[in-house]
Amino acid sequence: MSKAAGGSAPAAESCPSAPAGASTPTGVDDLSKVTDEELLQWSKEELIRSLRRAEAEKVSAMLDHSNLIREVNRRLQLHLGEIRGLKDINQKLQEDNQELRDLCCFLDDDRQKGKRVSREWQRLGRYTAGVMHKEVALYLQKLKELEVKQEEVVKENMELKELCMLLDEEKGVGCAGSRCSIDSQASLCQLVASATPYVRDVGDGSSTSSTGSTDSPDHHKHHASGGSPEHLQKPRSEGSPEHTKHRSTSPEHLHKPRASGTPDHSKALKGPSPEHHKPLCKGSPEQQRHPHPGSSPEVLPKHVLSGSPEHFQKHRPGGSPEHTRHSGGSPEHLQKHALGGSLEHLPRARGTSPEHLKQHYGASPDHKHASGSGGSGGGSREGTLRRPAQEDSSSHHRNVYSGMNESTLSYVRQLEARVRQLEEENRMLPQGSFRLSSGADGNNSSLNSPASFSGHTTPSQQPEPVVHSLKVVWRKLGDAAGSCPGIRQHLSGNQYKGPM
C-alpha cells in the first residue's frame, strides 16, 4: 500500500496540473467535505491525485498509530513486570507480617508466664525467708548451748588432767602404807569435791571415808597399835608377834564394830584362837587359804569386780548353800567372778573397806619393790599380763562407758587393765606360798601359826604390794567417779544398804 502510494505520488506529480480557474482538490483538506457535484466536475487525473494523496495521509496516520501502539505495549510490559515484582514483595511482606504476629503472640504468652513465675517466686522467697529466719534462730540457740557444753567439757577435761597429774605425783611419791598417802588422798578428794559439781554418794567404795562405810580407817584408827609408818613397816619386815596380830583377818575382826567395848574386841585384835583355827583348817588347801570370803586379800579383787544383784544374793552372810559353796574360794569361783566392774560388792563380801586393808596389808615402797622382785618376777610380769583395754566389750561395760569422754574412758580402761594384772599377780602369789608352807613345816606347824592360817608364811611372800596397788587403783576409780557422772552413777547405783 505504501508502495502504491509511493508510485502514485510521482504519477500525480507527473500529471498535468488542472486549470487554475477550476476548483482543484489541492485546496481541499478533506475529500469528505467535497460534494458529489464537485467531484463529478473533476477530471480523472484530479480524482486520482486526490485519492492518492488521501491514501498516503491515511497510511502515514496508520504508521503513526502502530508505532504508538508498539510503544504503549512496551510500556505496558514494563508496568506488568513492575506489578509482578510488587506482588512478590507484597507476598514476602505478608509472610513477615505473619511471622511477626506469631512472635508477638509467643512473646505475650512468655510474658504472661514470666509474670506468673515471678509472682510464685516472690511468694516462695518470702516463705523461704521466714523459714530460714526461724531455722537460723534455732541453730544459733543450739550453737550457743553447744558452746556452753563445750566450755563445760573443756573445764572438766582440765580438772581431770590436773587430777591425773596429782594422782601420778602421789603414785610417784609412793607413800605405800603411811599416813601421808591418806592425807594426800583426802586432799585429792577435797579437790575433786570443789572442782566438780557432783557430790560423791555415801558408801560408793571410794578411797575417802563415808558414813555409809562403817569399816573405813577413820573408825578403825584404834585397831592399829601405833598408827605410824614405822609401826606399819616394822611388823611386815620382821615377822614379830605384833605383825601376826595385825595380820589376823578373821570374820569376827572384820565385822566387829570399832566402837564396841566387849572382850571379844580384844580377842579380835589378837587373832582367832586355835579352836577357831581347827575347823577352818581341816578342809582343802583352797579352804585353808580362803576360810571366808572376807579373810584373805586375794579374794578382794575377785569379789569386788562382780556387780550383779544375783551375785550379791549369793554372797550375803547367812545365805543359801550356794553361799557356803562360794565361800570355799575355789579357783573356778575366782575365775568366774573376776571380770565384773562394780565397787559396791567390796563392803558386801568383805565387810570392810580398802582403807582397812591398807592398815593391815599396806607396805612401804621398799618392801613393795623387794617382794615384787623376789616373789614371782612381778616387774617383768607386768608387761606380759597386761591385756589391751579393747578386749572388754561386754554390754555391761558399754553401758558404763556411754557417758564418758574419750580421755576419761581411756584412763578408766587403763585402770581396769591394771586391776586385771594385779588379779593375776594376786592369784599366783598365794599358790606358791601355800606350797612352801605345807612342804616346809608339815601339817601341824603350818596349821597352828596365824601366818599359815592366812595363807602366807614369810614377809617376802606376802601380797602387800598387790593389795596396796589394788587400793591405789580403786582410789583412782573412786576419784574418777567423783568427776565423771557416768562412773559415779554406775558405782553409786547399787550401794550396800544392808546391815554391816
From Swiss-Prot:
Bias kind Basic and acidic residues: ranges: 231-254, 383-395
Region of interest called Disordered, as start-end residue ranges on this chain:
1-30, 200-405, 426-465
Coiled-coil ranges from the UniProt annotation: 38-104, 132-171, 404-429
Give residue spans, biased composition: Polar residues. 434-463
Ranges of compositional bias, category Gly residues: 372-381
Q: Which residues form the signal peptide?
A: none
Gene Ontology CC annotation, any one: adherens junction
A Pfam family cross-referenced in the UniProt record is CCDC85
Coarse class of the primary localization is other
Biased-composition ranges for Low complexity? Answer: 1-23, 204-215
Positions where Asymmetric dimethylarginine occurs in the chain = R488
Q: Which InterPro entries match?
A: CCDC85
Keywords (A to Z) from UniProt = Cell junction, Coiled coil, Methylation
Presence of keyword Coiled coil:
yes
Where, subcellularly, is it found?
Cell junction, Adherens junction
UniProt subunit comment = May interact with ARVCF; CTNND1; CTNND2 and PKP4.
Family the entry assigns: Belongs to the CCDC85 family.
- Cited function: May play a role in cell-cell adhesion and epithelium development through its interaction with proteins of the beta-catenin family.
Question: PANTHER family from the entry?
Answer: COILED-COIL DOMAIN-CONTAINING PROTEIN 85A, RE60986P
Q: What is this protein called?
A: Coiled-coil domain-containing protein 85A
Q: Which gene encodes it?
A: Ccdc85a
